[in-house]
Amino acid sequence: LRVVVAESRIKGMDYMIKTSDTESIYLLDDAFQHRSIFTGLSILLTTYRNPFFKDFILPYGNLRENKKGYKRANIIIVTKCPINMSLDQKSYFINKIKPKIDQKIFFSSIKYSDFIINKNETLPIKELEKEEFLLVSGIADSYHLRNHLKYLKFDYFDFSDHHNYSKNDLNKILDKSNGKLILTTEKDYVKLSVLIKSKSLFYIPIDFIFEKKE
């Protein structure tokens, strides 16, 4: 697996094509509006809590284009769904989206691990029942994670998606944790573990469960 970061998608793709095998598959992240590159397969993600058909165009909402743009997608994935969704719940989304004949709809859920991990050790999540901890996340919507941990006692810091942690952020995190265990997402752990040299920093792994509904 090769990862290429480029401000210009065209230059990035040109580099990949010139330096890869002809049989390679190229996966572009966050590229639904990049019309300058023709894709063979377009996948649209929309969350269970905030589906695109209930949203509005920026700045009033979060959409970057008209809702009708979903018709360009080959596959639509409703993410962060409840595990074991009912047929009624699935039917609601299908009726709202009204997929074209050639579009496929999938439903995915997040399954959280029963363990928390860092570079030194793995602990059962039940260890978190013993004392309060600090939850730190820099993801688009931390509701799902906070809801999963709601039976535990914790304080939390919510940062924006793809947040680059500053020295000021780190000082706030360390001050608020006050020596307590710090729990974060696997994505944020990659950034924070470089900046916070503490054995008390852990992340909770996740798995994705897909259930197809066409």
Task: Show which residues each predicted segment covers.
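Residue-level signal for inorganic ion chemistry
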Residues: 29, 73, 108, 138, ...
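Short, flexible loop segments at boundaries between secondary-structure elements
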Residues: 111-115, 160-163, 199-214
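Acidic anion/phosphate-binding donor-loop and adjacent secondary structure
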Residues: 113-123
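Conserved beta-strand/loop subsegment of P-loop NTPase cores
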Residues: 43-46, 70-81, 96-112, 130, ...
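Phosphate/Mg2+-binding loops and adjacent switch elements
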Residues: 1-99
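A C-terminal functional module that forms or caps the active site or interfaces directly
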Residues: 142-177, 181-192
